Structures are given as structure tokens and as C-alpha cells.
A protein has these predicted regions:
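Alpha-helical transmembrane segments and their immediate juxtamembrane cytosolic regions
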Residues: 2-265
Length: 265
């Protein structure tokens, strides 16, 4: 009989074998066996940087160009996936948590300079990593579900960058790790349920923005073909790149926005 062990279902239909093979350089943690182009973790980080930049250009400079926001949806599922991989591979979870906390605090003044409210994405990742630590130690699926739901609701009310959705993505990648078909199904279900929920909220509040952005979030599914190509390897060790790039690119875009606003006045 299968059982829940905090990281997923193990047993007859579980992923115990895959988890034991998931060292860097071993079989890919998500994608099925494929030939052709494969992508390491460094390559995925570069895609995140590009998608995030496009997304923020759309948010700040060309808000009417919704296709820019759609391209930007690639970023969060890849970041959530890499966080889960980092959690399973790190030898120093405390250092990982501390690094996220430090950069979350350092990036927040820049984030609030650019955006009027909310918390930056490093807080999403910090909360997600803490959640992984907690659920790994819970043996009850019901307590796990209650904890994940509570953290997601809290993320919505404290206005994490991705509200509840980023935390839920982290959990999805965690419990389906090593089983790509389940990853596709679970992520699709999450995003469709989220879009449906906010369609109802939008209808009841008369605010179309809720429905629009959460239908755009379905574009997160575009990240799945890229994750299917993940080869399980770290690639170049440039872990500081994303941490530094995030606040720097926001500052540069903010400066560009001010220049454009000044030129148009």
C-alpha cells in the first residue's frame, strides 16, 4: 500500500526509486527520457531572468501588451521547480534559508520603490522553502493539506508577489517530483482551479483585473516543455546571479520608466 512520507506517495505507485536517483548528474528529476536538447539548472535560471525581465517591462512600460505578461509567466514555475531541486540537493538548508531571507530584506526597498504594495518574490521562495521543511516532517496527508492551504491563504493576505499561487506551485513540484505526468496534471489542475476561482471573484466584485491576470497565469503551463528537458545537472555555479539581477533590473526599469515619463511630459 502506498503511504505519504512528507515528500510524496511512496510504495507501489510511489516515487521512492526516483528520489534515490535524484542527485545532480543522475537521472532528471522531472522530465521523461528524451533525446535532443537538454537544459541544466543554469540554463533554466537564464530563462527565468529573461522571462522575468520581459514580464516587468510589460508591467511597468507596456501594460497594454499582454503578450509580454504571458511570456513572463514562464518565470515562476521554473523558479518554484528549482527551489524544490535546491531543497533536495542542499547540504546546508539553514544557509539556503538565510540567503533567501537576506536577499528578500535587501530587495524589498527596491521592490516597493517600483511597486506600491506587496512583497518581493524572494519572500515567496522563503515561505515555500519553510513549507517544504515542515511538510517533510509531517506524516499525515490531512495535516499536510491543512498546512499548505493555511500557508497559501496567508500568502494571499500578506500579498506575496505571487499571492498563494507561488507557494502552491512549490508544493506541487515537491509532491510530484520524479513523475512528470503527475506534475503536468497537478500544475494544470492548480492553474485551472485558480482561474475559475478568480473568474467567480471577478464576476461578484465587478473587477475584471482579477479574471484577466489569473487567466494569463495559465501561461505558466508553457514552462512544462522546458522543465521536461531538465537534465538533472547544476551547470555553471552562478548562484549569486539571480539574487543580484533581481533588484538591479528593477532599478534599471524604474529609471527607464522615469526617463520615458519625463520625455513625454
Amino acid at each position: 500500500m502506498a503511504r505519504y512520507d512528507g515528500s510524496g506517495w511512496v510504495g507501489k505507485y510511489g516515487n521512492e526509486k526516483m528520489r534515490n536517483q535524484s542527485k545532480y548528474g543522475a537521472k532528471a528529476a522531472v522530465g521523461p527520457e528524451q533525446t535532443g536538447l537538454r537544459i541544466d539548472a543554469f540554463g533554466l535560471k537564464l530563462i527565468v531572468i529573461a522571462a522575468m525581465t520581459v514580464d516587468h517591462i510589460g508591467t511597468l512600460i507596456y501594460p497594454e501588451a499582454l503578450w509580454l505578461r504571458l511570456v513572463g509567466r514562464l518565470a515562476m514555475p521554473i523558479v518554484a521547480f528549482l527551489l524544490v531541486e535546491g531543497y533536495h540537493h542542499t547540504r546546508h538548508l539553514g544557509r539556503y534559508l538565510l540567503r533567501l531571507l537576506v536577499f528578500a530584506v535587501l530587495a524589498q526597498p527596491v521592490y516597493r520603490l517600483v511597486f506600491p504594495h506587496g512583497l518581493n518574490v524572494f519572500f515567496d521562495l522563503l515561505v515555500g522553502l519553510c513549507l517544504l521543511w515542515a511538510v517533510q516532517r509531517i506524516r499525515s496527508r490531512w495535516l499536510t493539506a491543512a498546512l499548505v492551504l493555511a500557508v497559501g491563504v496567508a500568502g494571499f493576505y500578506v500579498t506575496l508577489d505571487w499571492w498563494h499561487l507561488g507557494v502552491f506551485m512549490v508544493f506541487v513540484f515537491h509532491v510530484t517530483r520524479g513523475r512528470f505526468g503527475w506534475t503536468v496534471a497537478a500544475l494544470s489542475g492548480l492553474l485551472l482551479a485558480n482561474a475559475g476561482l478568480f473568474a467567480v471573484v471577478s464576476a461578484r466584485t465587478g473587477e475584471p483585473g482579477y479574471q484577466l491576470i489569473n487567466f494569463i497565469n495559465l501561461g505558466c503551463l508553457l514552462a512544462l516543455p522546458l522543465l521536461a528537458r531538465y537534465n538533472g545537472r547544476r551547470g555553471r555555479d552562478c548562484r549569486a546571479l539571480f539574487y543580484v539581477f533581481y533588484p538591479v533590473h528593477l532599478l534599471l526599469l524604474y529609471a527607464l520608466l522615469k526617463v520615458l515619463a519625463g520625455a513625454g511630459s
